[in-house]
Design a protein with these regions (language model features):
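Alpha/beta-hydrolase-fold serine-hydrolase catalytic core, especially in secreted/extracellular enzymes
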Residues: 2-10, 16, 297, 349, ...
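Short, well-ordered alpha-helical scaffold segments within catalytic/effector domains
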Residues: 251-256, 278-286, 445
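C-terminal subdomain of alpha/beta-hydrolase-fold enzymes, centered on the catalytic histidine
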Residues: 401, 413-472
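Conserved beta-strand scaffold positions in the cores of enzyme catalytic domains, especially
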Residues: 230, 266-268, 372-374, 459-461
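A Trp-anchored, charged/polar loop motif used as the substrate-binding/catalytic surface
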Residues: 198-220, 292, 345-361, 436-451
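Flexible, membrane-associating and regulatory peripheral segments of lipid-active enzymes
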Residues: 1-250, 254-268, 290, 323, ...
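A structural motif corresponding to the C-terminal end of an alpha-helix
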Residues: 258-265, 358-371, 447-458
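Serine-dependent carboxylesterase/thioesterase catalytic core
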Residues: 234-238, 269-434
Length: 472
């Protein structure tokens, strides 16, 4: 594969290329300091091309631009959508679905893509014909920063120092786990159960450790008194306030009912959704729950996989079959596909051990799940994540940018860093622990379909059947 990819386009180049608006540093506080996820120098704009109708006049010129292998493309659409990908990934997608949109030397024919994009499939289909407004080429992470240093150290721990130098971040299961861990560890709240914090008003003056300890005391008291509690479990790349904060603000009457019903015993389970699998999340949640606790669960998106696991019983006989039976990984390169298959085999072996531990802990703790509301869960897998990870994450990032809660929020910056790292490294969705479980071909979907659920749970499911259009 060539180390460069050629963009063939008619556009107006900008002399001093800016960063895309989506990736500019926006902090809520004027004295917030540097962004730990997007530090100075992490992104450098190499080029920006205007392709919209207003730019395709006298100033537009036909040109060819070389994108380096370690650079990222940011493609802005006129409808507000943004795609962050690598030029080589876009080129590979076109080679599979629309080779006529590539030149004789593999160059990407953007003029033809603009005209014919609506008829394409795969990644190119998301660049709806005629809607591309700007294309940026960005140099990403020219030198290691604290996140990369932490990821390499974590990788050494995960491999126990054996051969970690030969493992690349983002192109192996452990390398991707370490990279996602290094990003997620910088989030404001560490994993664990917390007492619900009011969306408005000053935060409690206590550390995460103190807050978790306070929640533990309350949960122990509730279990001893036989009182029910309510636990919220958030979704991918989010937090409890990000997933459920509007419920308290916009549905005040409903929230008052919940507070009365549970006498204020409402809790938030914060967890890592990328570096950890739902099995790891479920074990963390269970570890924080006192034995025999009566609880109700409300989950959103990927959090539904965590909630489902907590509701299982007697699934030991299914654990040995927790492995991928499908040879396809979405990789067009045979060597890359072989690596992904081998990595998945090892990862699923580790997850079988985790499932055995979870089954034992469920039998010991015996949580009493009384009510369970599951919203938009990928219980049988989601093809939104299985087609192309760049598209899925770019769409997620675009959506988060429309939610006021995430404006200037460190969680939003963390998501940007994740999307950029995955794009520049062409990371497979199968190698991201928290996303692999959401793929339709993942053994998680089969386990949740076949495993018995404890009787007596009142369950409500809010679901839909959608097919994405454009980037969203």
């Amino acid at each position: 594969m060539s180390s460069t990819t050629i963009l063939d386009l008619t556009a107006t180049p900008q002399e001093q290329a800016p960063l895309p608006a989506l990736l500019r540093n926006v902090r809520r506080a004027t004295d917030a300091g540097d962004d730990p996820f997007m530090p100075p120098g992490y992104l450098q704009a190499r080029a920006c091309f205007e392709l919209g109708p207003t730019a395709r006049g006298a100033t537009a010129v036909s040109q060819k631009f070389e994108v380096q292998a370690d650079e990222v493309l940011v493609i802005e659409l006129a409808d507000g959508g943004v795609l962050i990908t690598s030029a080589s990934e876009l080129q590979a997608s076109l080679a599979r679905s629309r080779p006529d949109l590539l030149g004789s030397q593999g160059e990407i024919l953007f003029d033809r893509l603009r005209a014919d994009g609506a008829a394409t499939r795969g990644l190119a289909a998301d660049l709806v014909g005629g809607l591309i407004s700007r294309v940026f080429a960005l140099a990403v992470g020219a030198s290691d920063d604290a996140i990369i240093s932490d990821a390499r150290a974590k990788l050494g721990e995960l491999t126990r120092g054996r051969g970690s130098e030969a493992i690349e971040l983002g192109v192996s299961w452990l390398g991707t786990k370490a990279l996602m861990w290094a990003i997620e560890k910088r989030l404001e709240r560490q994993p664990g159960i917390y007492c619900w914090q009011a969306v408005q008003g000053a935060a409690a003056a206590e550390s995460d450790e103190q807050a978790r300890a306070r929640a533990q005391r309350e949960l122990q008291a509730a279990a001893a008194a036989g009182e029910p509690v309510l636990v919220f479990v958030h979704g991918t790349g989010s937090s409890t306030r990000g997933s459920f904060g509007d419920l308290q603000l916009d549905e005040r009457e409903l929230w008052s009912i919940l507070e009365r019903e549970f006498d204020g015993r409402i809790y938030a389970f914060e967890h890592r959704t990328l570096s950890e699998s739902p099995i790891e999340n479920a074990r963390q949640l269970l570890a924080a729950l006192p034995a025999g606790l009566r609880l109700s669960l409300v989950t959103h998106s990927r959090g539904g996989l965590v909630g489902d696991l907590i509701c299982l019983e007697n699934f030991d006989s299914l654990i040995e079959h927790y492995r991928s039976d499908l040879p396809a990984t979405g990789e067009t390169d045979t060597a890359a596909a072989t690596v992904v298959q081998r990595e998945l085999g090892d990862a699923h072996g580790e997850q079988r051990q985790l499932l055995r531990a979870l089954a034992s802990e469920l039998a010991e703790k015996k949580p009493v799940v009384q009510r369970y509301v599951r919203v938009a869960s990928p219980a049988q897998g989601t093809r939104l994540a299985s087609g192309n990870l760049d598209v899925f994450l770019s769409g997620l990032l675009t959506l988060l940018g429309q939610i006021p809660f995430f404006f200037g929020n460190p969680l939003y910056s963390a998501c940007k860093r994740v999307v950029l790292e995955i794009a520049r490294r062409r990371t497979s969705a199968h190698l991201v622990p928290g996303i692999e479980a959401m793929l339709p071909e993942s053994p998680m979907a089969r386990l949740l379909r076949d495993a018995p659920v404890r009787p007596g749970i009142e369950m409500a499911v809010i679901a839909g059947d959608i097919e994405g259009g454009g980037l969203l």
